[in-house]
């Protein structure tokens, strides 16, 4: 009996040792279940309705029809407050301190029929007397505005409501900038990136008209998008209580904004890296100086570790950061050429029992060579210079994780076939709505928002504006594929060039030590089995 027991234990130990030593450990893979609107509603007739809307935007309430959910906004003739003022030479804008509330009252009507044929005159699925504001920094000056609206109940209190099947909340965003002629950059990244990034906002296409007296003005195709906030169904971290020893918070790196609570951290104060952190949670009314100071202290510790010249200190960064989230953030943003990420609209959150995590994803209008003031180079990586990442990439363990994660995702949600199919199917789903939006805004786009021409690395002038929606989609797909193909061949050698030789690969060292220990166990198990067999 004992001999059989020893033999069994020996075999089991041998198998475990073999698996752990010879099977390469891969980074943890997290997949979030996420449905795509264009797949859920693929049977909708996307060719209904006109393809042309005049530049003035006026549409007939009796004739307008769309297969997309339809929002009707009515502000009863009110003007949106201009919350920014300009300097005398109009070179800079600053927030007007006299305007404390950017919202105006609005009636928000949603029409979303089961047959996917939505008319302005149809019975509404939902009507709310809430409030609305214009969103954005530079984008607030675009002719096609982006909006944020808040749902209210009959007493003027915030009302949580599910819209288009998304998690209930009172705060919603209508976005899709005039600068994205494909209409799908945000949708693509939120859907695909949301597969691996928890709390990434869901977004659903819709069309929007503004009621102006007895007339209706067509505003275009929009994405109804969840906001990034601490809430159930959003960034669902624990509710922080003042006496809690561990902190829960949501912060955002961006430009300095004195109208919201800003943090003073070691790196921002010393200007070691770009950007400032604002606090999104706890709310301003709950953010005491003590809590604010504790958050600043935690972040300063992380920054001092990352930017330390003492490698024994630097190597402890994994004690503070959810490293896998930073790996995924690098891969997604480099793949989609979103070089605003890490600088602007970059969110981080911390649950009381967990490490600091980067995410969720937000704001991709300018990704994939869609930045007006600069030409993206598909044969280059720019994310290596972003705050914190410029230090993380000095660690060979982090570089190894990034490259292996990229290789893994290229076989699934970042494969050429997956992305191209996603784009084609989304374009088919948008159908005539995409042409309506283009006819409404393309003239304004050409007048002041088209992508500037630049010389590429070979000295050739590149014109990035296309004459048709089909050509725009082709450029979109080509841009994705060209950069991905370059990453396939060059990501590892490029990132390896940033690795510091004096950074000991503690991860590899640990795995090597573990391998030796387990190899010994494996050999001992063989000896035990042989002894049992020989009867000793």
What are the language-model segments listed below?
Residues 195-208, 338:
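Short, well-structured beta-strand/strand-turn elements
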Residues 205-217:
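Beta-rich nucleic-acid/ligand-interaction surfaces
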Residues 21-31, 81, 280-343, 349-522, ...:
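Middle-to-C-terminal accessory/interaction subdomains
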Residues 178-199:
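A conserved alpha-helical element in kinase catalytic cores
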Residues 25-117, 502:
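N-terminal module-boundary/linker segments of secreted carbohydrate-active enzymes
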Residues 155-156, 169, 196-201, 216-328:
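Internal "kinase-insert"/substrate-recognition segments embedded within catalytic cores
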Residues 110, 116-176, 291-294:
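Conserved oxyanion/phosphate-binding beta-strand-loop segments in alpha/beta enzyme cores
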């Amino acid at each position: 009996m004992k001999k059989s027991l020893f033999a069994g234990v020996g075999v089991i130990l041998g198998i475990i040792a073999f698996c752990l030593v010879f099977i390469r450990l891969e980074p943890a893979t997290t997949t979030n279940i996420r449905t795509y609107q264009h797949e859920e509603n693929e049977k909708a007739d996307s060719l209904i309705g006109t393809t042309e809307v005049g530049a003035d935007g006026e549409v007939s309430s009796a004739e307008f029809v769309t297969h997309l959910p339809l929002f009707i906004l009515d502000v009863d003739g009110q003007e949106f407050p201009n919350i920014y003022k300009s300097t005398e030479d109009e070179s800079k804008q600053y927030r007007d301190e006299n305007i404390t509330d950017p919202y105006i009252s609005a009636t928000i009507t949603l029409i979303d029929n089961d047959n996917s044929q939505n008319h302005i005159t149809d019975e509404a699925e939902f009507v709310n007397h809430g409030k609305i504001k214009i969103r954005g920094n530079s984008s607030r000056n675009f002719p096609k505005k982006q909006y944020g609206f808040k749902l209210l109940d009959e007493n003027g209190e915030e009302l949580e409501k599910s819209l288009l099947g998304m998690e209930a909340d009172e705060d919603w965003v209508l976005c899709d900038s005039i600068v994205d002629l494909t209409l799908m950059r945000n949708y693509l990244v939120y859907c695909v990136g949301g597969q691996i990034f928890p709390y990434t906002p869901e977004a659903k296409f819709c069309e929007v008209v503004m009621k102006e007296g007895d007339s209706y003005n067509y505003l275009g195709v929009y994405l109804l998008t969840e906001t990034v906030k601490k809430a159930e169904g959003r960034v669902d971290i624990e509710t922080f209580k003042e006496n809690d020893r561990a902190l829960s918070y949501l912060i955002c790196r961006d430009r300095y904004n004195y109208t919201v609570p800003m943090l003073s951290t070691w790196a921002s104060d010393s200007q070691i890296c770009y950007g400032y952190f604002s606090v999104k949670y706890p709310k301003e009314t709950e953010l005491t100086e003590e809590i604010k100071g504790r958050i600043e202290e935690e972040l300063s510790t992380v920054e001092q570790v990352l930017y330390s010249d003492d490698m024994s200190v630097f190597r402890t960064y994994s004690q503070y950061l959810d490293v896998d989230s930073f790996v995924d953030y690098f891969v997604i943003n480099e793949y989609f050429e979103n070089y605003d990420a890490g600088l602007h609209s970059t969110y981080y959150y911390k649950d009381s029992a967990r490490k600091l995590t980067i995410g969720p994803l937000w704001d991709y209008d300018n990704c994939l060579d869609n930045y007006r003031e600069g030409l993206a180079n598909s044969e280059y990586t720019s994310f290596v210079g972003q705050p914190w990442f410029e230090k993380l990439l000095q660690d060979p363990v982090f570089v190894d994780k990034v490259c292996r994660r990229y290789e893994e995702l290229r076989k699934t949600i970042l494969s050429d076939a997956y992305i191209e199919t996603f784009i084609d199917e989304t374009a088919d789903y948008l159908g005539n709505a995409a042409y309506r939006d283009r006819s409404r805004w393309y003239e304004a786009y050409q007048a002041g928002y088209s992508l500037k021409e630049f010389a590429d690395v070979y000295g050739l002038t590149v014109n990035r504006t296309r004459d048709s929606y089909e050509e725009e989609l082709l450029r979109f797909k080509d841009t994705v594929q060209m950069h991905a193909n370059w990453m396939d061949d060059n990501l590892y050698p490029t990132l390896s060039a940033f690795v510091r030789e004096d950074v000991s690969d503690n991860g590899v060292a640990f795995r090597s030590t573990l391998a030796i220990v387990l190899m010994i166990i494996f050999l001992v198990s063989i000896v035990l089995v042989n002894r049992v067999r020989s009867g000793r």
